[in-house]
């Protein structure tokens, strides 16, 4: 394959082992790699942007191996990709990668994910983009995930990568020889039991820690072919899931079921 110009970001921060493994995997295949990541952990920030404070970026090539340019950015994951595309890169990249995330990005959790948001920023700019996550917060071997992410991205580019397609790849927490086959999957609908831990600081002010737990994954919910498993079900078989996502959130249900009263009897202007 012709060497690619690849932009890599994440939400775990520029020091995270997952993104360093992904950058090394891409560089080892001869690609030109630029990493632009938050300067600290920014997980679950979704597609948030920094608009009330300045964004700062500094070169940190020494944190990465040969052939990798790296920047540490004070902004969110989406900020990182925006800044890279507008200011830091000399040329438009061929591919945007985000990850490898330290934990899953499954089902409707993608709405909260900084990892997916960084990739989505690439998609919104008309670029092929892939988000990759290891579906366990404790797992720390990112080599298989990094190599599989590169395989998927290179194969997709060599075949056909449609416009507005974001690929969301989740890898089970196991070694390659124990892993099942990669399959296309649907996005599951995840329901949480929201729990907040109430605490009091030394100044007698109350504060809270969010500690919700998944209580239900709706296997039959969501769009997509019925013969595709959900991403959650696929991971539970120790097999990687690959879910196609797009930025268009327009409702695909029965339009006749929309509450007509919302737009009825509006005054003429």
UniProtKB/Swiss-Prot annotation:
Summary of the function given for this chain in its UniProt record: Nucleotidase that shows phosphatase activity on nucleoside 5'-monophosphates.
HAMAP family registered for this protein in UniProt: SurE (MF_00060)
Species of provenance: Prochlorococcus marinus (strain MIT 9313)
Residues the entry annotates as binding a divalent metal cation: 11-12, 43, 101
UniProt enzyme class: hydrolase
Protein name: 5'-nucleotidase SurE
Organism superkingdom: Bacteria
Family matches, as Gene3D superfamilies: Survival protein SurE-like phosphatase/nucleotidase
Lineage start: Bacteria, Bacillati, Cyanobacteriota, Cyanophyceae, Synechococcales
